[in-house]
Amino acid sequence: SSKTLQSLAELDGKNPTNRKLNVQTWNTAEGAKVLFVEAHELPMFDMRILFAAGSSQDGNTPGLALLTNAMLNEGVPGKDVGQIAAGFEGLGADFSNGAYRDMALVSLRSLSAADKRDAALTLFDQVIGQPTFPADSLARIKNQLLAGFEYQKQNPGKLASIELFKRLYGDHP
């Protein structure tokens, strides 16, 4: 244990190496802001798209952002949830999505070799641009969310968080 402490002591006073990121920014023709960091160290890329579509936008329909976001990868024309998952997996790609208070996001991590990248981007484009919202998935996910809401009613931490936001922001989303 003294060696561990000695090795940590060696770090005292040393500044960590700081890698400068070259962040390029631009706006698309549609007005979306793009932040881009190029790194050739790994043969892969990460892409995240953020939307101002979090739960604060739900209004009188609590859970709308969560439900909509959860349904994105449940189906596209010609593919069900299993085929979508297998498509990403077969390409070595990872699709993820989530909805939070102030935003919703979708992300893709894929190999950058053209054959893998292009196929992963095509599937990603279908998932976020052409979701079919299948009825069976809608019923299943809706039940999961309702069960989650019931659990939250019994969770002191969640109840405290709700009360805090209510006191801080009132009726403001």
Each predicted region: which residue ranges?
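Generic detector of short, locally flexible boundary/turn motifs and exposed helical patches
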Residues: 1-3, 10-16, 69-76, 171-173
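M16 family metallopeptidases and their MPP-like homologs
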Residues: 37, 41-73, 79-129, 142-150, ...
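General structural signal for secondary-structure boundaries
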Residues: 7, 80-81, 135
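Proteolytic maturation boundary segments
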Residues: 1-48
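Peptidyl-prolyl cis-trans isomerase
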Residues: 130-133, 138
